[in-house]
A protein has these predicted regions:
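C-terminal end-of-chain micro-motif
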Residues: 1, 164-165
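Catalytic core of non-heme Fe(II) oxygenases with the double-stranded beta-helix
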Residues: 68-140, 144-149, 154-163
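Non-heme Fe(II)/2-oxoglutarate
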Residues: 1-68, 84
Length: 165
């Protein structure tokens, strides 16, 4: 059921020169407030991250054109203080979704479609690409910082066309 929906790439070589700086940007920009797990990050690496995302997506998906190039990078960071999570999707803001795992702490992510559910355990420096409408639930860390980034593409084509499902 999840075939052709979830794609995993190791981007270790692509981000090795700036990964630690990117983690520092995330930690420094985290808002100390309730629900501080998700926040928008202003990063000098945004163009590079989106280039990696788009290049990988073009390798495995059907041709697509980007409708909105007003790109954003969101950070999901959990630890002993902030570890809220829940099922969600990105269908209101995107067509293609990507998660980049910077510091995973051995935690994974669950995906759900209809009555089917799978659990996936990515590695540090992995990037997942999947349809924005696919429900998912990240596994939070309740100790050390778990840091991942969310990137989205809003396309002119439908998910069905792009993911060939």
């Amino acid at each position: 059921m999840f075939k052709n929906l979830i794609h995993c790439f190791s981007i270790k070589e692509d981000i090795k020169n700036f990964k630690e700086d990117l983690i520092k940007e995330c930690i420094n920009q985290r808002k100390e407030e309730e629900g501080g797990c998700n926040f928008k990050v202003q990063t000098k690496y945004m163009d590079t991250l989106y280039k990696i995302f788009i290049d990988c997506a073009k390798k495995i998906l059907k041709p697509f054109t980007i409708k909105d190039k007003n790109f954003k990078v969101w950070c999901y960071m959990t630890d002993s203080m902030y570890n809220d999570t829940g099922w969600h999707n990105h269908k209101k803001s995107a067509t293609i979704n990507s998660v980049i795992y910077l510091q995973i702490q051995g935690k994974g992510i669950s995906f759900k479609q209809g009555n089917e559910q799978i659990y996936f355990k990515p590695n540090n420096e992995d990037m997942l690409i999947f349809p924005a409408s696919l429900d998912h639930n990240p596994e939070p860390s309740t100790k050390d910082k778990r840091i991942s980034l969310n990137l989205e593409l809003l396309c002119n084509e439908s998910e069905k066309e792009i993911f060939n499902v």
